[in-house]
Regions:
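Acidic/polar loop patches that form or flank catalytic/metal-binding clefts of enzymes
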Residues: 201, 251-254, 282-283, 300
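Zymogen propeptides/activation segments of proteases
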Residues: 1-41, 51, 60-64, 376-378, ...
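Juxtacatalytic substrate-recognition/specificity segment
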Residues: 22-178, 185, 196-197
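Acidic/His/Gly-enriched intrinsically disordered linker/tail segments
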Residues: 149, 153-154, 169-242, 246, ...
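Beta/coil-rich, acidic/histidine-enriched accessory regions frequently appended to metallopeptidases
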Residues: 262-395
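Surface-exposed intrinsically disordered loops and tails
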Residues: 76-77, 86, 105-132, 136, ...
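Non-transmembrane alpha-helical segments in soluble domains
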Residues: 51, 58, 62, 156, ...
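Glycine-centered structural positions embedded in regular secondary structure
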Residues: 8, 15-17, 113, 234-236, ...
Length: 395
């Protein structure tokens, strides 16, 4: 397991099985277990809470996204139960991610959990990274103690990554998606599971909207900018949540997850397949731009269609419909401050604004031209590169 905040050095540690679920084992690294939970040490009761919570969400998530792989790679894909000591159960390992625990959360690496596909490769060992040979993801013990809501939402997020590895890579001969696309799907998983998990908006991906409004121009919609990761998460969720709320909700996400495409092609194919349309990606991008200007037809501020249901377990008599609820990107809760002023909605650049480079992969810069009256107006643009597009939006 990792031993530094960059998740670049790994060490071997002993862990003990502290909870067993229908679909999972919860292991706690011995250094971070205590009979009484506190700070970065968890007890068996907390481990069981997470096992129980994961057991409930597992069939709900797989109903939408599909299943994780029961294969492990060893000179070809082989049955995991023949090569893994934990069989086909999912292993949730709890410890201090980054080995950086502090009583002050802002001194931690900020990683609540992660999935690492190395564990799907039998006896893999390279540059200090070694496979645990099975289905694994990892949860931070400090967060597991202090913030159940964030941690349980992270379990849903990381499980989607595990499922996505199967749906896109294992089942499609090594197909690889962009990281932004994978993160988008994981945040949409959190989004549709929010009501079931009892998560407040401030602990959900919707909370990224403030970052999006203030800094969307630091990451293209279809980009994962390693220097501004927080902005890439925000732009990916903004676009993905718009697509889900306007073109089919959880049923659309199901098609995105399960089709044999990735990235923009996957999204476009799923939208057209579900809606009987012939949109290009550029068509969808244009509609998304309208939402950033407060359009009432294409908007984040509408509930997604609820056409997909889960009707088992706790929901056998009252099906769960995977609600993805409306949120207004112009609300005060998503406002930001700059130069002593408060702003609502995505930042608009005017003539005296700072210079910002347009990001690749569908980067956006919103420029305000001004307010006009009268029957006609002429607006002139200087020509840019062939890769740049200018959209003129009049309100």
């Amino acid at each position: 397991m990792d031993n530094n905040t960059n998740i670049s050095t790994f060490v071997q540690k002993s862990a003990t099985l502290r909870a067993v679920g229908t679909y999972c084992y919860v292991w706690v690294v011995d250094d971070f277990y205590s009979s009484t939970a506190g700070e970065n040490k968890v007890d068996s009761a907390i481990a069981q809470e997470y096992a129980d919570a994961f057991d409930k969400m597992y069939p709900m998530i797989t109903n939408v996204f599909g299943n994780e792989s029961d294969k492990i790679y060893y000179y070809g894909w082989r049955n995991m139960e023949d090569y893994s000591s934990t069989g086909t159960k999912i292993n949730i390992v709890v410890y201090d991610i980054g080995n950086d625990y502090s009583l002050s959360e802002n001194q931690q690496c900020g990683i609540v959990g992660y999935f690492y596909a190395k564990d799907y490769f039998y006896n893999y060992s390279e540059k200090g990274v070694t496979s645990n040979n099975g289905k694994y993801f990892y949860i931070d013990s400090g967060y597991a103690n202090s913030n159940f809501d964030t941690t349980i939402s992270t379990l849903a997020h990381e499980f989607q990554h595990m499922v996505n590895y199967n749906q896109k890579t294992v089942l499609n001969d090594g197909l690889t998606s962009g990281q932004w696309y994978n993160e988008m799907l994981s945040m949409l998983c959190e989004d549709m599971m929010q009501e079931h998990l009892g998560i407040k908006d401030e602990d959900s991906p919707k909370a990224r909207t403030t970052t999006f409004n203030a800094y969307y121009y630091y990451s293209g919609i279809s980009e994962y900018n390693s220097k501004n990761q927080i902005c890439s998460y925000a732009t990916a969720f903004s676009f993905g949540s718009f697509i889900a709320r306007n073109f089919g909700g959880a049923e659309l996400v199901q098609k995105i997850s399960k089709n044999s495409y990735v990235d923009n092609d996957s999204i476009t194919n799923a939208v057209n397949s579900l809606n009987g349309t012939k949109y290009t990606y550029d068509d969808l991008f244009e509609k998304y731009l309208l939402a950033l200007f407060g359009d009432s037809t294409y908007t984040h501020n509408k509930d997604a269609d609820c056409t997909l249901e889960y009707n088992s377990g706790d929901y056998s008599s009252n099906p769960y419909e995977y609600p993805m609820t409306a949120y207004n990107i112009f609300d005060s809760e998503y406002s930001f401050s700059a130069n002593g002023k408060k702003y609502y909605g995505p930042a608009i650049f005017y003539a005296n604004a700072k210079s910002v480079d347009l990001r690749p992969e569908n980067g956006i810069l919103i420029h305000g031209i001004g307010t006009f009256s009268g029957s006609s107006v002429s607006v002139s643009f200087s020509s840019g590169t062939s890769a740049e597009k200018i959209y003129l939006i009049i309100k």
